[in-house]
């Protein structure tokens, strides 16, 4: 049904060749009416444009509905996008509630470049563990300075409002993924009105955004809305992306907010729709074992095959093995210390005792590890879970205790289990079952400050090249200092050129600086590009280093 809806929407496209009025580029015509953006010096912005009806009231916990309202006055597109309602890990203190339930918008940023009449497009799906974040969490000044690409940022439902699921057709889940999908359709339909090229759309994302991008690619009809895709430090096989146990969490959520009498999905859904959104989102605190662990209590699920408009009804591994996914060029990446998220959190000192969380891990490993590393719901028995916890500790720590001194070994464990291993598995499956080019790179060049320092709230630890150190050279983020080093400046420009050339390539070629990525499809070995401060190098490997 979802595919049929896509074809219907694609058949109704209203596409123009450029912004409506060349004499006034801030004024744009859409099927809904006229809108006016802002002049930002070297680019124009058109922000907070609704692509779906507000997901409130009866539309809460439903697939998004295309925005159909007509504007009688000129729409004010100068207001920055609001974040979707969330329990935000990066808000200090006990009250982490932020955002608004009415949030399904896209924001368009168009270069001032008189040398060209149209621009290729990069659509960005933000990260945040499917729980927090928003279109405004990353800056775009670096991105827009080159003047060659239109950027579109997508907002989508998060946390329980975006991903609660009972595992059946009545409360199927994946509403946030369906939001992203509708936003991509909106971009395909409307971007020409801003001077964008609907035939040249690249979709990228970082962390949960990267996992989202991969999940979008795993739908065969993704090729109708985009030409290529890149998943930075996140893919559909990461253990925190597609999870089990959603039904239990859905009914536990109901119990917390006063829907404990519900014994079936229909009753639960009706009751949850009647509750204030703030109560539903604030209930996230009850699913955290300590601090912000697990970092994704609500995320994507495999939906029931009979669910209306199901986004995915098979596990990603099975989808890839079937070959029934979009055959578009796709790249997947990781950093050498990606596991700094969320491992660095364990170095924070507890307000109550002054001890780091990592010290308490010695006594709580068997309790906490399944939540930290996302295998709590995938194990059949407690014994299986304990055996796996014991195996991991022995492999990475041996007989040593968890401490600040042994932190790097713990971070390596997090990197392998949460990011690197699943990146390698994804790459291996795609090279065996895909047809379009599949690429990969690893980034090793630590930022002076990054997400590690932000989580640990300390600057005396060297975290290495952590989660976001590459992506934040494309889109600024407050966790790192804004001033780039000279080597980072070069890498940033190479990344931007990489995106530009990738979306324009007719044969899916991908290059960074002087290095051309090697395609993994049909290769007997893994092809991995290594990017460091000294340049780039193609590696041919049996397994990731």
Swiss-Prot record:
- The signal peptide here is 1-19
* Transferase found in the keyword field: no
- GO molecular function annotation: carboxylesterase activity
User: Where the protein is mainly located, per its record?
Assistant: secreted
Catalytic site positions:
207 (acyl-ester intermediate), 467 (charge relay system)
Cystine pairings recorded for this chain: 84-103, 259-271, 515-536
Spell out the reaction equation it catalyses: a carboxylic ester + H2O = an alcohol + a carboxylate + H(+)
Q: Which UniProt keywords apply?
A: Disulfide bond, Glycoprotein, Hydrolase, Secreted, Serine esterase, Signal
Enzyme Commission number(s): 3.1.1.1
Highest taxon above the source species: Eukaryota
Localisation per UniProt entry: Secreted
Q: Which CDD domains match?
A: Esterase_lipase (cd00312)
Q: Which Pfam families match?
A: COesterase
Read off the InterPro entries from this record: AB_hydrolase_fold, CarbesteraseB, Carboxylesterase_B_AS, Carboxylesterase_B_CS
**Gene3D superfamilies linked:** alpha/beta hydrolase
Q: Which residues are glycosylated?
A: 113, 421, 507
Q: Which GO CC annotations does the UniProt entry carry?
A: extracellular region
The UniProt entry's sequence similarity note says: Belongs to the type-B carboxylesterase/lipase family.
Name-wise, this protein is Esterase-5B
- What gene, per UniProt, encodes this protein? Est-5B
């Amino acid at each position: 049904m979802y595919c049929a809806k896509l074809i219907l929407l694609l058949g109704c496209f209203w596409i123009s060749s450029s912004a409506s009025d060349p004499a006034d580029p801030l004024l744009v015509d859409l099927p809904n009416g006229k809108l006016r953006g802002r002049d930002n010096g070297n680019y124009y912005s058109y922000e907070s444009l609704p692509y779906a009806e507000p997901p409130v009231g009866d539309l809460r916990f439903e697939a998004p509905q295309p925005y159909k309202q007509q504007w009688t006055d000129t729409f004010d597109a100068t207001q920055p996008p609001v974040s979707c309602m969330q329990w935000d890990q990066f808000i200090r203190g006990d009250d982490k509630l932020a955002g608004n339930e009415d949030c399904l918008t896209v924001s368009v940023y168009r270069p001032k470049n008189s040398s060209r009449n149209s621009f290729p497009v990069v659509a960005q799906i933000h990260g945040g563990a499917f729980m927090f974040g928003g279109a405004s969490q990353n800056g775009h000044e670096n991105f827009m300075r080159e003047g060659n690409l239109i950027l579109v940022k997508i907002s989508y439902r998060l946390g329980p409002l975006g991903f609660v699921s009972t595992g059946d057709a009545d409360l199927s889940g994946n509403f946030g993924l369906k939001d992203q999908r509708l936003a991509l359709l909106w971009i395909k339909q409307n971007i020409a009105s801003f001077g964008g090229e609907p035939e040249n759309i690249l979709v990228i994302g970082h962390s949960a955004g990267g996992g989202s991008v991969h999940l979008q690619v795993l739908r065969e009809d993704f090729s109708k809305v985009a030409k290529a895709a890149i998943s930075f430090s996140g893919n559909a096989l990461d253990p925190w992306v597609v999870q089990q146990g959603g039904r239990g969490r859905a009914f536990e959520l109901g119990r917390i907010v006063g829907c404990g009498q519900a014994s079936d999905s229909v009753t639960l859904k009706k009751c949850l729709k009647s509750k204030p959104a703030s109560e539903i989102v604030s209930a996230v605190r009850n699913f955290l074992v300590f601090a912000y662990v697990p970092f994704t209590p609500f995320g994507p699920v495999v939906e029931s095959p009979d669910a209306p408009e199901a986004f995915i009804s098979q596990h990603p591994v099975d989808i890839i093995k079937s070959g029934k996914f979009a055959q578009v060029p796709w790249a997947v990446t990781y950093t050498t210390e990606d596991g700094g998220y969320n491992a660095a959190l364990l170095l924070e000192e507890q307000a109550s005792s002054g001890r780091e969380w990592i010290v308490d891990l010695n006594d709580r490993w068997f309790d906490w590890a399944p939540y930290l590393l996302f295998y709590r719901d995938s194990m059949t028995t407690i014994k299986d879970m304990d055996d796996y916890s014991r195996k991991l500790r022995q492999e990475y720590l041996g007989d040593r205790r968890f401490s600040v001194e042994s932190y790097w070994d713990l971070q390596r464990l997090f990197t392998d289990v949460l990011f690197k291993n699943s990146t390698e598995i994804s790459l291996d499956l795609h090279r065996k079952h895909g047809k379009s080019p599949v690429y990969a790179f690893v980034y090793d060049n630590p930022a002076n400050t990054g997400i590690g320092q932000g989580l640990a709230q300390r600057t005396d630890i060297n975290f290495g090249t952590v989660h976001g150190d590459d992506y934040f050279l494309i889109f600024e983020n407050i966790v790192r200092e804004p001033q780039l080093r000279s080597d980072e400046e070069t890498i940033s420009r190479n990344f931007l050129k990489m995106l530009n050339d990738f979306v324009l390539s007719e044969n899916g070629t991908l290059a960074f600086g002087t290095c051309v990525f090697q395609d993994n499809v049909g290769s007997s070995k893994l092809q991995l590009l290594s990017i460091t401060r000294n340049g780039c190098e193609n590696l041919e490997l049996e397994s990731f280093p």
